[in-house]
């Protein structure tokens, strides 16, 4: 059985991530749902965007939490991907939910991005939009900040929630594809052996150096927001505890319906998916973007793949499942019976059937 295909930030390989056009395109490509990120503006608006910084997706430098909804709505969030998406606007949570409501079968994995001021009204504001748009049944609320999920469960017990857990800290801090492209590299840990050669040139380039500094700062801010009030040592201990996922999830004072982790975890911690299934918890893996990854992960019992390639992942999965399906047994050859005497012809015919 093919796992659910959930489009990471929409069809983000083909369209600007986390925009309405990306969500539409994902469902047109046959995805079972979309994943998106919601965060709060300085005037308590709710917008769909992954990073706090907007530098990678607009022509200005800024942070979502320092800007108003009006400021953000004036910006072009599409041209960075391709000129055909010029003037694509940042989506509000309300707009995104209304769109997904119109798309039959669209499950939404909605990630809560922690507020920098630990605002206790953030989760209630999100839940109110889900109520207003009648999207409670279609949404799975996910977050790395498990305190936010606990609050959501207390306020809306019927809402499904999913605990996001960290993979390797190094991979979390890796720059996104657009920065690797600027450095003449691809994106991934495989490039670490050649990155040293690119760093002197990029460090001498004020623009590239600025991008890298702002990117790392943004990621560290996000990590601190997910563990408010904790020292770096306490944060590290928390991350280490997450390596034994069944034990960590059992230690929570609420029960998530889903756990979502980096797909490499499936290679490092054999059996954890089955263990979570025994606890009644489903598992999604991110970010599954290659045919090789699909082939290997189909050996696990993961329930969903979060992917930037909803246009290809289902095709790869179905191809692999067809290739590894047990061959149908060929019926044994039946030797025709000798013709029966005329008086027994009917009986013989019946036996041959």
Per-range role (PLM):
Residues 1-353:
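Phosphate-group recognition and catalysis centered on beta-loop-alpha active-site segments
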